[in-house]
């Protein structure tokens, strides 16, 4: 059975989540793990995913206005390719019902050796009900695009999401 749990700062699984977070995301793409888990701003939510009682992945979501932005999403390497990512996204859709859910993915760029994995990642989200948007931006010298579930998303919506959090996000094509 697949289960999704909200994770708080005293969860027994924080060590597993932090380990996967550090393994799955390069250091230059990571925020302060403790800041997100403590959630003093009230904008972060952390979810753990479990298959038959065993931890298999997590998502960290940043909420603003009517948008839930999955900023980190990972499953254990040995659990990939088993449909658990799709189950996790479906669970997120139920939990965040009535809100638009967005993800950012690295865009394909000419002569990039990671284009195949970027294409597969994008197709994974599209197969799971996400749609393309007009939103493109650059961060840490990387080109990103936004996909959305549960509605549409404009550049203005994306800018307002960040503005509401007190952050000025440049959505130029870059």
Predicted regions and their residues:
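Short amphipathic alpha-helix that is part of the acyltransferase structural core
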Residues: 1-31, 144, 156-164, 171-174
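Active-site rim helix/loop that mediates acceptor-substrate recognition in acyltransferases
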Residues: 22-51
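Conserved beta-strand in the GNAT
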Residues: 48, 54-63, 67-74
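Short acidic/glycine-enriched loop/turn segments that link adjacent beta-strands
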Residues: 66, 139-143
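Conserved acetyl-CoA-binding loop-helix of GNAT-fold acetyltransferases
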Residues: 75, 81-95, 118
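Conserved GNAT acetyl-CoA-binding A-motif
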Residues: 96-117
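Conserved acetyl-CoA-binding loop of GNAT-fold acetyltransferases
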Residues: 123-133
């Amino acid at each position: 059975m697949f289960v999704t749990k909200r994770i708080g700062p005293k969860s027994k699984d924080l060590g597993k989540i932090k380990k996967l977070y550090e393994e799955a995301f390069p250091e230059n793409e990571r925020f302060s793990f403790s800041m997100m888990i403590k959630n003093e701003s009230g904008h972060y939510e952390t979810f753990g995913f479990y298959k038959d009682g065993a931890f298999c992945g997590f998502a960290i979501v940043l909420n603003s206005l009517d948008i839930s932005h999955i900023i980190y999403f990972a499953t254990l390497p040995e659990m990939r390719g088993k449909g658990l990512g799709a189950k996790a996204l479906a669970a997120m859709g139920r939990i965040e019902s009535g809100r638009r859910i967005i993800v950012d993915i690295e865009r394909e760029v000419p002569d990039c050796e990671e284009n195949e994995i970027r294409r597969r990642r994008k197709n994974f989200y599209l197969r799971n009900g996400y749609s393309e948007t007009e939103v493109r931006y650059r961060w840490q010298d990387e080109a990103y695009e936004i996909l959305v579930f549960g509605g549409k998303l404009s550049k203005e919506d994306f800018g307002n999401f960040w503005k509401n959090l007190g952050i000025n996000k440049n959505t130029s094509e870059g």
